């Protein structure tokens, strides 16, 4: 999954947790540069929560990541305008194309793998080394996430 805004609702969080518990590898890439501070801090909150559950998270360090892609089981791909956030799910008129094509899925996976070379893999240690002020901003932004 590549997304600039990662503020999942309960259904997406549950789906990701079920996938991880089923032994499916879940990789998510988010940007390093915030264009909306509250959205980015909420994204960091959810990133930390998922790292603790077994999701692999990458922070793209080569500019602002604006890709909105997903590959499922090496067979299904999603590309479009929808972010993984409340606004895209409930408010905005976003659209994604779902393609059932192994070649496209492989191509998007190759792009993701190439992009990981420009990433920092996020770990629990990364979050533990953050200041209390930054963690406060993450928790506060999480409270605002339904309206972000």
PLM region spans:
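PLD/PLD-like phosphodiesterase catalytic module centered on the HKD motif
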Residues: 4-148
């Amino acid at each position: 999954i590549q997304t600039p805004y990662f503020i999942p609702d309960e259904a997406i969080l549950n789906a990701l947790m079920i996938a991880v518990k089923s032994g499916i590898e879940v990789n998510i890439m988010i940007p390093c540069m915030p264009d909306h501070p509250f959205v980015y801090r909420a994204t960091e909150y959810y990133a930390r929560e998922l790292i603790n559950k077994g999701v692999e998270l990458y922070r793209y360090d080569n500019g602002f990541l604006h890709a909105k892609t997903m590959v499922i089981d090496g067979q299904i791909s999603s590309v479009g305008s929808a972010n993984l956030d409340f606004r895209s799910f409930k408010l905005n008129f976003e659209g994604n194309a779902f393609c059932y094509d192994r070649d496209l899925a492989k191509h998007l996976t190759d792009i993701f793998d190439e992009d990981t070379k420009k990433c920092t893999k996020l770990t629990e240690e990364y979050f533990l080394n953050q200041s209390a002020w930054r963690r406060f901003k993450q928790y506060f932004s999480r409270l605002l996430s339904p309206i972000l």
